[in-house]
Amino acid sequence: MTDKEKRLERQSRIRNFSIIAHIDHGKSTLADRILEKTAAITQREMKEQLLDSMDLERERGITIKLNSVQLKYKAKDGEEYIMHLIDTPGHVDFTYEVSRSLAACEGAILVVDAAQGIEAQTLANVYLALDNNLEILPIINKIDLPSAEPERVRGEIEDVIGLDASEAVLTSAKAGIGIEDILEQIVEKVPAPAGDPEAPLQALIFDSLYDAYRGVIAYIRIVEGTVKPGQKIKMMATGKEFEVLEVGVFTPKAMPTDELTVGDVGYLTAAIKNVGDTRVGDTITSAVNPAQEALPGYRKLNPMVYCGLYPIDTAKYNDLREALEKLELNDSSLQYEAETSQALGFGFRCGFLGMLHMEIIQERIEREFKIDLITTAPSVIYDVYMTDGEKIVVDNPSNLPDPQKIERIEEPYVKATMMVPNDYVGSVMELCQGKRGHFIDMQYLDANRVSIVYEIPLAEIVYEFFDQLKSNTKGYASFDYELIGYRPSTLVKMDIMLNGEKIDALSFIVHRDYAYERGKIIVDKLKELIPRQHFEVPIQAAIGQKIVARSTIKAMRKNVLAKCYGGDISRKRKLLEKQKEGKKRMKQVGSVEVPQEAFMAVLKMDDSTPKK
């Protein structure tokens, strides 16, 4: 057999697939079982959620990053198949990670919980898979639960998604039932990768990782051609050239190999020092014999939510910059730029995909880089049209121009799809109305579950929406959203003033109708959170020059009359007047420290949904 024939023969036995599911429907457990079944890992190494390698993922029990692993499986037809399993996150903020892993596969296993049925995210991920023309294999998991209703769920898959579920494997990943059937279905139904191992190299970078010793490690999927150590490669987006040092696959550990060819999913190192040189979604090609065009990459994802991150210890500003650079390498959807605030000093304005993403980045910086952070209230991106015809983009409330110069402000709207049990439809609709939502559609999926669609401003979803939705439905609702564009709204900027000074980090943009109530809530919250000073501190919420709410932190005062035994009123009055003078002087020079909780209070306005 020639080299080419060997490669083609091997290629016909490659199967690339990923697992998609709603949060908690059991995809990481299923991945564990598949690893066990194909003996990729020994019993000793087995731990729950093996592919979730970040501590944070294991603690929260969610998958954040995608992971890939190569497995060998001896099928019933006697052939040994090479499978690449790419584990994906299920949470709405990480849809991007999902779309990246799907671009590297030919098939997807769709895991549906036998008790809960189809959830909002299941649908979102299925549509992503269909966009990538993947072969989808439905699987009904958790059939060992007492509340499992596999037949109902089978019907649901057919009705709601329109997939043929007659051959859907009934499994229990926890008990290890039905795992072999899944592997056989993958062999039978998922197509082998197409491509020519002799063609010019085209490899898709679907993730990258920074290693202090080896520089950047790119995770790649070979679409055409072959790559070996010593070969000169070129990045198509940046035009930079490198020499390959090592290629290999993950079994979950990194294992160097002689070459990677069509259909392989593995990694490549090439002494790439600069993070910006390996863009996720870029195509790697050979420098000597380059491909004509790049692979259709991923869409560059735009952040939905922005917030300021400031180090509590200002000396750590450079450490924070390095931390963000390293995180950005693994997380192509994180964006940041330097900014300064009068209240908080130097920091960064960062863009995130959503609230969970924001929390996780914060937590990773605090854990992995040991930097304590202050975060400002998250805000979305507004399009501001000026009276002179100019359009500016505002992601930070303190940059909003003077109201006299603004013609209109447009804010992003999302289409939110919620799947809720029947009994909670009323409270969910009330929640959405309170969040300025427009009702679009409602469909009964079966006797117990309803899909509700609303159009809601993104700014309203950013604050606590998911938590409130969960608490209104006892945790049963699932939720997914997509951006549908910008619409004009009557929005105003609210400033918070302490002792007559604006605190820029506490400013936020709010709908005019809700401004008074939001202002009142924040002022009252700050009154509880800011410690009492030796002088009186007024807290005011203002729109432009107009004060809409005020609260006062009373001064702490010593009892100056304690020493005064005599009852002489003039003596007492003199002491009190003297104290008053002193307080007045302190007030002029005194500055007020704002604790971190106060910044968070602006975010957590849970009771702030005005009842209309």
UniProtKB/Swiss-Prot annotation:
Subcellular location, principal = membrane
> What keywords is this UniProt entry annotated with?
Cell membrane, GTP-binding, Hydrolase, Membrane, Nucleotide-binding, Protein biosynthesis
Matching InterPro entries: EF-4 (IPR006297), EFG_III/V (IPR035647), EFG_V-like (IPR000640), EFTu-like_2 (IPR004161), G_TR_CS (IPR031157), LepA_C_sf (IPR038363), LepA_CTD (IPR013842), LepA_IV (IPR035654)
* Domain of life from the UniProt record: Bacteria
Start and end residues of each tr-type G domain? 12-194
Where does it live in the cell? Answer: Cell membrane
State the EC number(s): 3.6.5.n1
GO terms of molecular function: GTP binding; GTPase activity; ribosome binding; translation elongation factor activity
Please write the reaction equations for the catalytic activity of this protein: GTP + H2O = GDP + phosphate + H(+)
Q: Which SUPFAM superfamilies match?
A: EF-G C-terminal domain-like, P-loop containing nucleoside triphosphate hydrolases, Translation proteins
State the Pfam families in the record. Answer: EFG_C, GTP_EFTU, GTP_EFTU_D2, LepA_C
Please name the PANTHER family in this protein's record: TRANSLATION FACTOR GUF1 HOMOLOG, CHLOROPLASTIC, TRANSLATION FACTOR GUF1-RELATED
HAMAP family, from UniProt? LepA
Q: Which family does it belong to?
A: Belongs to the TRAFAC class translation factor GTPase superfamily. Classic translation factor GTPase family. LepA subfamily.
Q: This protein is called what?
A: Elongation factor 4
Q: Which organism is it from?
A: Bacillus pumilus (strain SAFR-032)
- The gene is lepA
